[in-house]
Protein backbone atom coordinates (compact mmCIF):
# COMPACT_ATOMS: atom_id res chain seq x y z
CA UNK A 1 0.00 0.00 0.00
CA UNK A 2 2.92 2.33 -0.63
CA UNK A 3 2.21 5.56 -2.48
CA UNK A 4 2.16 4.76 -6.22
CA UNK A 5 4.36 6.61 -8.69
CA UNK A 6 2.54 9.70 -9.93
CA UNK A 7 2.56 10.31 -13.66
CA UNK A 8 3.30 13.87 -14.78
CA UNK A 9 0.33 16.10 -15.53
CA UNK A 10 -0.02 19.76 -16.40
CA UNK A 11 -0.47 22.02 -13.40
CA UNK A 12 -3.86 23.78 -13.64
CA UNK A 13 -3.82 27.33 -14.98
CA UNK A 14 -6.10 30.29 -14.28
CA UNK A 15 -8.49 29.15 -17.01
CA UNK A 16 -8.91 25.80 -15.24
CA UNK A 17 -9.97 27.28 -11.93
CA UNK A 18 -13.56 26.70 -10.79
CA UNK A 19 -15.98 29.50 -10.02
CA UNK A 20 -15.87 30.47 -6.37
CA UNK A 21 -19.00 30.86 -4.28
CA UNK A 22 -17.31 33.44 -2.06
CA UNK A 23 -15.16 36.49 -2.72
CA UNK A 24 -12.84 36.49 0.27
CA UNK A 25 -9.85 38.83 0.31
CA UNK A 26 -6.59 37.82 2.00
CA UNK A 27 -5.36 40.06 4.80
CA UNK A 28 -1.71 39.91 5.94
CA UNK A 29 -2.85 40.68 9.49
CA UNK A 30 -5.20 37.71 9.59
CA UNK A 31 -3.49 35.04 7.49
CA UNK A 32 -1.29 32.01 8.17
CA UNK A 33 0.57 30.13 5.43
CA UNK A 34 0.31 26.33 5.64
CA UNK A 35 2.89 24.21 3.81
CA UNK A 36 1.29 20.78 4.00
CA UNK A 37 3.33 17.53 4.07
CA UNK A 38 6.04 18.60 1.62
CA UNK A 39 8.29 15.76 2.81
CA UNK A 40 10.62 13.71 0.65
CA UNK A 41 8.48 10.61 1.21
CA UNK A 42 5.47 12.21 -0.48
CA UNK A 43 7.21 14.46 -3.01
CA UNK A 44 9.35 11.61 -4.36
CA UNK A 45 6.20 9.97 -5.72
CA UNK A 46 6.17 12.67 -8.42
CA UNK A 47 8.45 12.64 -11.46
CA UNK A 48 11.34 14.95 -10.63
CA UNK A 49 11.77 17.88 -12.99
CA UNK A 50 8.29 17.49 -14.48
CA UNK A 51 4.93 19.14 -13.95
CA UNK A 52 3.22 19.45 -11.54
CA UNK A 53 5.96 19.15 -8.93
CA UNK A 54 8.23 21.78 -10.50
CA UNK A 55 5.52 24.45 -10.36
CA UNK A 56 4.38 23.19 -6.97
CA UNK A 57 7.66 23.80 -5.16
CA UNK A 58 8.39 27.05 -7.02
CA UNK A 59 4.99 28.54 -6.23
CA UNK A 60 5.12 27.56 -2.58
CA UNK A 61 8.55 29.16 -2.38
CA UNK A 62 7.22 32.41 -3.86
CA UNK A 63 4.32 32.45 -1.44
CA UNK A 64 6.55 31.78 1.52
CA UNK A 65 8.94 34.59 0.58
CA UNK A 66 6.05 37.04 0.33
CA UNK A 67 4.49 35.88 3.57
CA UNK A 68 7.75 36.24 5.47
CA UNK A 69 8.15 39.76 4.08
CA UNK A 70 4.64 40.68 5.25
CA UNK A 71 4.98 39.10 8.69
CA UNK A 72 2.55 36.27 7.95
CA UNK A 73 3.33 33.18 10.08
CA UNK A 74 4.52 30.10 8.18
CA UNK A 75 3.42 26.67 9.43
CA UNK A 76 4.57 23.27 8.16
CA UNK A 77 3.07 19.86 8.76
CA UNK A 78 5.23 16.74 8.69
CA UNK A 79 4.29 13.16 9.43
CA UNK A 80 6.63 11.21 11.74
CA UNK A 81 8.38 8.02 10.70
CA UNK A 82 7.79 4.56 12.17
CA UNK A 83 4.48 5.51 13.74
CA UNK A 84 3.11 3.43 16.57
CA UNK A 85 0.16 1.37 15.24
CA UNK A 86 -2.10 2.90 17.89
CA UNK A 87 -1.16 6.39 16.72
CA UNK A 88 -1.51 5.57 13.04
CA UNK A 89 -4.75 3.64 13.59
CA UNK A 90 -7.03 3.58 10.54
CA UNK A 91 -4.48 5.26 8.29
CA UNK A 92 -2.73 1.88 8.14
CA UNK A 93 -5.82 0.27 6.61
CA UNK A 94 -5.73 2.73 3.71
CA UNK A 95 -2.03 3.55 3.31
CA UNK A 96 0.02 0.94 5.10
CA UNK A 97 2.67 1.74 7.74
CA UNK A 98 3.71 5.08 6.25
CA UNK A 99 7.15 6.62 6.56
CA UNK A 100 10.10 4.68 7.89
CA UNK A 101 12.31 5.99 10.67
CA UNK A 102 15.06 7.25 8.38
CA UNK A 103 15.72 11.00 8.38
CA UNK A 104 15.45 11.34 4.59
CA UNK A 105 11.78 10.41 4.24
CA UNK A 106 10.68 12.62 7.13
CA UNK A 107 12.61 15.67 5.96
CA UNK A 108 10.91 18.61 4.24
CA UNK A 109 12.31 18.98 0.71
CA UNK A 110 15.45 21.10 0.57
CA UNK A 111 13.90 23.86 -1.56
CA UNK A 112 11.31 24.52 1.15
CA UNK A 113 13.30 23.73 4.29
CA UNK A 114 11.79 25.36 7.40
CA UNK A 115 13.59 28.33 8.90
CA UNK A 116 14.06 29.22 12.55
CA UNK A 117 10.91 31.36 12.77
CA UNK A 118 8.67 28.75 11.13
CA UNK A 119 6.42 26.41 13.08
CA UNK A 120 6.61 22.68 12.25
CA UNK A 121 3.67 20.58 13.45
CA UNK A 122 3.73 16.81 13.76
CA UNK A 123 0.94 15.51 11.53
CA UNK A 124 -1.18 12.54 12.62
CA UNK A 125 -4.32 12.66 10.47
CA UNK A 126 -5.52 14.10 7.17
CA UNK A 127 -6.42 17.42 8.78
CA UNK A 128 -3.62 19.72 9.87
CA UNK A 129 -5.82 20.69 12.83
CA UNK A 130 -6.23 17.17 14.21
CA UNK A 131 -4.00 16.45 17.23
CA UNK A 132 -1.97 19.64 16.67
CA UNK A 133 -2.10 23.12 18.20
CA UNK A 134 -2.72 24.87 14.87
CA UNK A 135 -6.18 26.09 15.86
CA UNK A 136 -4.97 27.20 19.28
CA UNK A 137 -2.06 29.08 17.71
CA UNK A 138 -4.28 30.84 15.18
CA UNK A 139 -6.76 31.92 17.82
CA UNK A 140 -4.04 33.12 20.13
CA UNK A 141 -2.53 35.19 17.32
CA UNK A 142 -5.95 36.50 16.28
CA UNK A 143 -5.74 35.01 12.79
CA UNK A 144 -8.69 33.56 10.92
CA UNK A 145 -7.37 33.00 7.39
CA UNK A 146 -5.38 29.96 6.25
CA UNK A 147 -3.47 29.85 2.96
CA UNK A 148 -3.25 26.16 2.02
CA UNK A 149 -0.43 24.75 -0.10
CA UNK A 150 1.23 21.35 -0.45
CA UNK A 151 0.11 17.76 -1.03
CA UNK A 152 -2.09 15.96 -1.58
CA UNK A 153 -4.83 18.30 -2.77
CA UNK A 154 -7.82 15.98 -2.44
CA UNK A 155 -6.71 14.41 0.86
CA UNK A 156 -4.97 16.40 3.58
CA UNK A 157 -5.21 19.80 1.92
CA UNK A 158 -8.94 19.49 1.25
CA UNK A 159 -9.79 17.99 4.64
CA UNK A 160 -7.85 20.80 6.31
CA UNK A 161 -9.83 23.35 4.29
CA UNK A 162 -13.08 21.70 5.38
CA UNK A 163 -12.11 21.75 9.04
CA UNK A 164 -10.97 25.37 8.74
CA UNK A 165 -14.44 26.22 7.42
CA UNK A 166 -16.07 24.48 10.37
CA UNK A 167 -13.90 26.53 12.74
CA UNK A 168 -14.86 29.81 11.03
CA UNK A 169 -11.44 30.13 9.43
CA UNK A 170 -11.35 31.31 5.81
CA UNK A 171 -9.26 28.91 3.72
CA UNK A 172 -7.46 30.13 0.61
CA UNK A 173 -6.85 27.02 -1.50
CA UNK A 174 -3.99 27.82 -3.89
CA UNK A 175 -4.71 25.93 -7.10
CA UNK A 176 -1.18 25.86 -8.50
CA UNK A 177 0.54 25.46 -5.12
CA UNK A 178 -1.09 22.11 -4.38
CA UNK A 179 -0.68 18.83 -6.27
CA UNK A 180 -2.23 15.38 -6.35
CA UNK A 181 -2.12 11.83 -7.72
CA UNK A 182 -3.65 12.98 -11.01
CA UNK A 183 -5.14 16.00 -12.75
CA UNK A 184 -8.60 14.51 -12.19
CA UNK A 185 -8.12 14.34 -8.42
CA UNK A 186 -6.49 17.78 -8.41
CA UNK A 187 -9.49 19.28 -10.22
CA UNK A 188 -11.91 17.45 -7.94
CA UNK A 189 -10.27 19.04 -4.91
CA UNK A 190 -10.48 22.51 -6.46
CA UNK A 191 -14.14 22.06 -7.41
CA UNK A 192 -15.13 20.85 -3.96
CA UNK A 193 -13.15 23.56 -2.18
CA UNK A 194 -14.59 26.35 -4.33
CA UNK A 195 -18.13 25.10 -3.91
CA UNK A 196 -18.17 24.07 -0.27
CA UNK A 197 -15.49 25.42 2.04
CA UNK A 198 -12.77 27.67 0.58
CA UNK A 199 -11.72 30.37 -1.85
CA UNK A 200 -9.64 28.94 -4.69
CA UNK A 201 -6.97 31.19 -6.12
CA UNK A 202 -3.81 31.07 -8.24
CA UNK A 203 -0.41 31.89 -6.79
CA UNK A 204 0.19 35.06 -8.80
CA UNK A 205 -3.27 36.41 -8.02
CA UNK A 206 -2.80 35.76 -4.31
CA UNK A 207 0.63 37.38 -4.36
CA UNK A 208 -0.85 40.47 -6.02
CA UNK A 209 -3.64 40.70 -3.44
CA UNK A 210 -1.21 40.38 -0.56
CA UNK A 211 1.24 42.84 -2.10
CA UNK A 212 -1.50 45.37 -2.84
CA UNK A 213 -3.07 45.26 0.60
CA UNK A 214 -3.37 48.78 2.03
CA UNK A 215 0.00 50.05 3.17
CA UNK A 216 -1.14 50.53 6.76
CA UNK A 217 -2.39 46.93 6.85
CA UNK A 218 0.97 45.65 5.60
CA UNK A 219 2.79 47.85 8.11
CA UNK A 220 0.66 46.57 10.96
CA UNK A 221 1.36 42.96 10.00
CA UNK A 222 5.09 43.45 9.68
CA UNK A 223 5.46 45.56 12.81
CA UNK A 224 3.41 43.43 15.16
CA UNK A 225 5.75 40.47 14.94
CA UNK A 226 3.09 38.24 13.35
CA UNK A 227 0.51 39.21 15.97
CA UNK A 228 -2.96 40.71 15.80
CA UNK A 229 -4.30 43.08 18.46
CA UNK A 230 -7.38 40.93 19.09
CA UNK A 231 -5.62 38.06 20.80
CA UNK A 232 -6.85 36.25 23.89
CA UNK A 233 -3.88 37.65 25.78
CA UNK A 234 -4.68 41.26 24.91
CA UNK A 235 -8.39 40.85 25.62
CA UNK A 236 -7.56 39.29 28.99
CA UNK A 237 -5.34 42.27 29.87
CA UNK A 238 -8.11 44.72 29.04
CA UNK A 239 -10.65 42.84 31.14
CA UNK A 240 -8.22 42.49 34.03
CA UNK A 241 -7.62 46.23 33.97
CA UNK A 242 -11.36 46.94 34.15
CA UNK A 243 -11.81 44.44 36.99
CA UNK A 244 -8.57 45.50 38.69
CA UNK A 245 -7.37 41.92 38.73
CA UNK A 246 -4.29 40.01 37.58
CA UNK A 247 -4.63 38.80 33.95
CA UNK A 248 -3.28 35.36 34.80
CA UNK A 249 -6.24 34.78 37.14
CA UNK A 250 -8.77 35.02 34.31
CA UNK A 251 -9.24 31.98 32.06
CA UNK A 252 -10.33 31.96 28.42
CA UNK A 253 -13.43 29.84 29.04
CA UNK A 254 -14.92 31.27 32.26
CA UNK A 255 -18.14 33.30 32.29
CA UNK A 256 -17.05 36.93 32.60
CA UNK A 257 -20.46 38.03 33.89
CA UNK A 258 -20.01 35.72 36.86
CA UNK A 259 -16.56 37.25 37.25
CA UNK A 260 -18.12 40.66 37.82
CA UNK A 261 -17.90 42.24 34.37
CA UNK A 262 -21.05 44.37 34.41
CA UNK A 263 -22.88 46.17 31.59
CA UNK A 264 -20.99 49.43 32.07
CA UNK A 265 -17.64 47.71 31.68
CA UNK A 266 -18.87 45.71 28.67
CA UNK A 267 -19.99 48.93 26.95
CA UNK A 268 -16.55 50.38 27.64
CA UNK A 269 -15.05 47.44 25.76
CA UNK A 270 -17.58 47.75 22.92
CA UNK A 271 -16.68 51.39 22.38
CA UNK A 272 -12.96 50.71 22.52
CA UNK A 273 -13.12 47.77 20.12
CA UNK A 274 -15.28 49.70 17.67
CA UNK A 275 -12.62 52.39 17.56
CA UNK A 276 -10.17 49.65 16.66
CA UNK A 277 -12.29 48.51 13.72
CA UNK A 278 -14.30 45.62 15.23
CA UNK A 279 -18.05 46.14 14.75
CA UNK A 280 -19.47 44.32 17.75
CA UNK A 281 -22.51 45.02 19.93
CA UNK A 282 -23.27 44.81 23.63
CA UNK A 283 -25.82 42.04 23.02
CA UNK A 284 -23.31 39.89 21.14
CA UNK A 285 -20.77 40.14 23.94
CA UNK A 286 -23.36 39.52 26.65
CA UNK A 287 -24.63 36.39 24.90
CA UNK A 288 -21.16 34.82 24.73
CA UNK A 289 -19.29 36.21 27.75
CA UNK A 290 -15.96 34.38 27.54
CA UNK A 291 -12.58 35.54 26.30
CA UNK A 292 -12.42 32.66 23.83
CA UNK A 293 -15.76 33.55 22.23
CA UNK A 294 -15.01 37.27 22.19
CA UNK A 295 -11.67 36.69 20.50
CA UNK A 296 -13.33 34.72 17.70
CA UNK A 297 -16.04 37.36 17.31
CA UNK A 298 -13.59 40.26 17.27
CA UNK A 299 -11.37 38.56 14.72
CA UNK A 300 -14.23 37.92 12.31
CA UNK A 301 -15.67 41.43 12.75
CA UNK A 302 -12.45 43.41 12.45
CA UNK A 303 -12.04 45.08 9.09
CA UNK A 304 -8.65 46.66 9.54
CA UNK A 305 -6.77 46.62 12.81
CA UNK A 306 -4.42 49.50 13.46
CA UNK A 307 -1.72 49.67 16.14
CA UNK A 308 -2.82 51.12 19.47
CA UNK A 309 -0.57 51.94 22.36
CA UNK A 310 -3.17 50.63 24.79
CA UNK A 311 -2.30 47.09 23.68
CA UNK A 312 1.47 47.39 24.03
From Swiss-Prot:
Organism (species): Bacillus subtilis (strain 168)
Domain Carrier residues, every copy: 229-302
Keywords: Hydrolase, Phosphopantetheine, Phosphoprotein
Protein name: Isochorismatase
Sequence similarity: Belongs to the isochorismatase family.
Broad class of enzyme this protein falls into: hydrolase
Gene: dhbB
Catalytic activity: isochorismate + H2O = (2S,3S)-2,3-dihydroxy-2,3-dihydrobenzoate + pyruvate
UniProt-listed Enzyme Commission number(s): 3.3.2.1
An MF annotation (GO) of this entry: isochorismatase activity
Domain of life, per lineage: Bacteria
Amino acid sequence: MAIPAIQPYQMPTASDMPQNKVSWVPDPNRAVLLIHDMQNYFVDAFTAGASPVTELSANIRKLKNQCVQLGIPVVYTAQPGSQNPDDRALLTDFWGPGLNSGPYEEKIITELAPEDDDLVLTKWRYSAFKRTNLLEMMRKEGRDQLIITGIYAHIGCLVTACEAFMEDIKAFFVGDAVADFSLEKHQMALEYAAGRCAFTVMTDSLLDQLQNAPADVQKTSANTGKKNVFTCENIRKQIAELLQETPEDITDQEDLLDRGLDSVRIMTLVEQWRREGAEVTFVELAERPTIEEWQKLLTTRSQQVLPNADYL
